[in-house]
């Protein structure tokens, strides 16, 4: 007699059979623009997806401009990433992309309402204030976003999963940040 499983039970069995789990990496910080961060994926289990959380705290200073307020757009939180890549030591790189292009690519796959900034909730998936009011002394700007980098075609694609526990496999995530002047699109005089 065949056993009837619910969708939730099938999903739980798939997660159990493929040994999917979340493994955190150490937090790293950048003190100035133009820097590069490198994360090495631990040699444990299988890799199907990488989540990268970027939390930015910037200081925006007003220069000679008469304007004291600038508006941000939907791609502002992603503009600070100049290059994002996942590199394997066999020469394959599933991602070599800049932040804005990644946001546009992800909008095809994900719900745009969670991908693009919410201006009210600082704890959401992506946050950026709608407007920045700057002074000559400087104004703090806080932005937050999460990059979801799938390595497989879909969640049920066992062929695309990378065997990270192999001693020969080396997986690195490299994040190149823009310089301070290119992190935001701002008018002259700022």
Set out the residue ranges of the language-model regions.
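Short, low-complexity Pro/Thr/Gly
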Residues: 1-190
